[in-house]
Design a protein with these regions (language model features):
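Conserved N-terminal structural module of periplasmic/extracytoplasmic solute-binding proteins
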Residues: 8-9, 23-122, 305, 311, ...
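C-terminal motif of bacterial Sec signal peptides marking the signal peptidase cleavage site
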Residues: 18-22
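Hinge/lid segment of periplasmic solute-binding proteins
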Residues: 42, 120-171, 182, 297-301, ...
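A structural signal for short loop-to-beta-strand junctions that line the ligand-binding cleft
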Residues: 106-107, 111-114, 142-176, 200-205, ...
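Extracytoplasmic/periplasmic solute-binding protein
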Residues: 161-165, 170, 188-234, 275
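Glycine-centered hinge/linker elements that transmit conformational signals in sensory
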Residues: 230-260
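Extracytoplasmic/periplasmic substrate-recognition and gating elements
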Residues: 290-354
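Conserved C-terminal helix/tail region of periplasmic/extracytoplasmic solute-binding proteins
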Residues: 368, 381-436
Length: 436
């Protein structure tokens, strides 16, 4: 799905710094070396042994992933080659974010990477395009080792088409020198504070559908029905959706609210001390922690009060990072083996330690002490119970633009309480419109 600003950030999914394939590539040959490869655009060959001991069968694989994961991917690929010395593996790396994977792969499936990372909302689109190779190697093991929700997100009609490895949603970072644990329990508590040096008490990307949906979910609204698979249902324009609209209009009008904070504004606000709390994800954990130092804190999203007096917990949209194998790869068994390696327990732990990515591996995720030792991942875990898994049905393509337009109209002041119902009706009508 989206991540409109985030995944083109995470998740965020992240996700910032997105580049397209072609901007950077790197080739490495390896039969056991842990050489991470050369600079972009160059090729290096490393043999790990003499020709007489090198694998006799040569296998070339192209791997795509986001810019921020390139060094990790290269390290993991070289370790895969070292663990499989019976073959000589060469790797070509391309920079493609999870958010852009579907777009780039579907330009020309035959020219796309053998193995690539994608966001779980793209599963159905990629399968329908014939772009994903069905997992036939070690399927039962992969299913058993990863969370049920992540496996469901990587499956279509009971068939597994990918290897989940990161669980993702958003939560709230805050500066604990400016806000207390009690303050951050509710938006009202945050916004009621007068804080020296702070111009923005609470920041949120209002015109970003991935975030915006959290308010509607918190009020009990549903996007594409109870399980997210009915393309004829969206009730954001019902009575409870109307109360969400009212709340957003009032919130955006508050001068202490940052209504259109993308990743760069969130990070700069914490860095210069003008921001007290913001909604974001694990992809920004490192920079925010560096800025806040001992005052670094994170928690689940806050509660908010509807116009009928009811207090509700803000929801969120969750998805997963998945590694897929190209349906047209010339080396399906090797590509599946590599995808499984890149997403195994050890490498999920590596990502957790290096990037603060929350694992889908059941054993790792159930290690509460370890997960909570990372403040951002601990906050993500708190919010997960209030999250709605991002659907991968094709109709979801219709969600992002009207969500953005609705948010922009609230920010611009053209969506008011007097025309709110009409704006919500138009929003839902656009979401449910027949796909072109």
């Amino acid at each position: 799905m989206k991540y409109r600003k985030i995944m083109t950030a995470i998740a965020s999914m992240t996700m910032a710094g997105v580049m397209l394939v072609g901007c950077s590539s790197n080739s490495t040959s390896s039969t056991g070396s842990t050489d991470s490869g050369s600079a972009a655009g160059n090729s290096t060959a490393s043999s790990g042994g003499s020709e007489s001991t090198a694998g006799s069968e040569k296998v070339s694989l192209t791997v795509w992933g986001p810019q921020e994961d390139q060094e990790l991917i290269k390290k993991m690929c070289n370790e895969f080659a070292a663990a499989n010395p019976e073959k000589t593996y060469s790797f070509t790396y391309g920079v493609v974010s999870e958010a852009d994977a579907q777009k780039e792969v579907n330009k020309d499936i035959s020219a796309a990477a053998d193995v690539f990372a994608f966001a779980s909302d793209q599963t159905a689109i990629l399968v329908n395009a014939g772009a994903l190779y069905r997992v036939t190697k070690n399927k039962d093991k992969i299913v058993a080792e990863n969370s049920e929700a992540s496996i469901s997100a990587a499956s279509i009609n009971g068939e597994l088409y990918g290897y989940p490895y990161v669980s993702d949603t958003y939560f709230m970072y805050y500066d604990k020198s400016k806000l207390t644990e009690d303050d951050v329990k509710s938006i009202e508590g945050i916004m009621s504070k007068n804080i020296d040096g702070v111009t923005t008490n609470f920041a949120f990307d209002t015109d970003n559908g991935w975030y915006q949906a959290g308010f509607f979910f918190g009020a009990g609204c549903k996007l594409f029905g109870d399980d997210g698979t009915d393309p004829t249902k969206c009730d954001f324009n019902n009575e409870r959706g109307y109360m969400v609209g009212e709340y957003l209009i009032d919130l955006v009008a508050n001068p202490k609210f940052g209504a259109n904070f993308d990743d760069s504004l969130v990070k700069s606000g914490f860095a210069d001390g003008t921001l007290a709390a913001a909604v974001s994800g694990v992809w920004n954990a490192g920079e925010i922690q560096k800025s806040l130092g001992d005052n670094y804190a994170a928690t689940k999203l806050p509660e908010f009060k509807l116009s009928n007096g009811e207090t509700v917990q803000m929801g969120s949209m969750a998805n997963f990072k998945i590694m897929g194998v190209n349906a047209e790869t010339k080396n399906p068994l090797d590509a599946m083996a590599l995808a499984e390696w890149l997403t195994n327990k050890d490498n999920q732990k590596t990502r957790f330690e290096a990037r603060s990515y929350a694992p889908t591996n059941v054993e790792l995720a159930s290690d509460t002490a370890t997960m909570n030792s990372n403040i951002a991942v601990g906050a993500l875990a708190q919010q997960a119970k209030y999250s709605t898994v991002q659907t991968s049905i094709g109709q979801c393509q219709n969600f992002w633009t009207p969500a953005e337009a609705f948010g922009q109209e609230i920010i611009a002041g053209t969506c008011t309480k007097s025309n709110l119902q009409d704006k919500l009706n138009a929003y839902v009508e656009a979401v449910l419109a027949t796909l072109s």
